[in-house]
Amino acid sequence: MRILLSNDDGYLAPGLAALYEALRPLAEILVMAPEQNCSGASNSLTLSRPLSVSRSAATGFYYVNGTPTDSVHVALTGMLDTKPDLVVSGINNGQNMGDDTLYSGTVAAATEGIMFGVPAIAFSLVHKEWAHLGDAARVAAEIVRHYLDHPLPGQPLLNVNIPNLPYEELKGWRVTRLGKRHPSQPVIRQTNPRGEPIYWIGAAGDALDASEGTDFHATASGYVSITPLQLDLTHTQMLGATRDWARAGSGAS
């Protein structure tokens, strides 16, 4: 078995090292991660300049001076002779639930695997500062082992969020849907030394839909949340109304 491991916090992140150690007994692991922290990079590819790949003398991890998506893209199309059995991303320093998934570099690295026909799993710790990271890595390894032993049909993309709890206090796994957040806080305006305005992106909004069945509800209740994602963004319930709207517009023109 071969696993391609990446993240969005960078190749020096504790979450990457912990996940690597937890997965080593399960498969051959190739690590390719961003050189820098790329949180919030989403699915961006670097098209304006060439990329370079380096290797850490300390860990053997490969890293690229680009985004999480670049990392997986370069590994799959430029380094590996054969496809890995699984792409794994994480462990992220902070949750990726609800609307977070659209911005998340952690989820994006996993998504790039799906783009090339490789099943993928993204792992995140619900709260920052790496509390109970070893326990989270243990859970992640259990999920990966279960997937390798009992693969899901097709090419699944799983988004996993793990509460920051001791292993013994976790209540198990729960399959969930994405919740929803309130809009993020407004940007924070400041002034640079030249007197020019600069802006910091505000904090994420609080949970708007954290009802039972959502990732927010599961993790708040002490469960590991597993959400199957898909790349098709088509709003199928709007197809009929949009078709009628377009037909009316084209007929009037």
From Swiss-Prot:
Principal location: cytoplasm
One MF annotation (Gene Ontology) recorded for this entry: exopolyphosphatase activity
Cofactor(s) recorded in Swiss-Prot or TrEMBL: a divalent metal cation
GO cellular component, one term: cytoplasm
Disulphide bond pairs: none
Keywords from the named record: Cytoplasm, Hydrolase, Metal-binding, Nucleotide-binding
InterPro entries membership: SurE, SurE-like_Pase/nucleotidase, SurE-like_sf
Similarity comment: family membership: Belongs to the SurE nucleotidase family.
Protein name: 5'-nucleotidase SurE
Species of the source: Burkholderia mallei (strain ATCC 23344)
Gene it is expressed from: surE
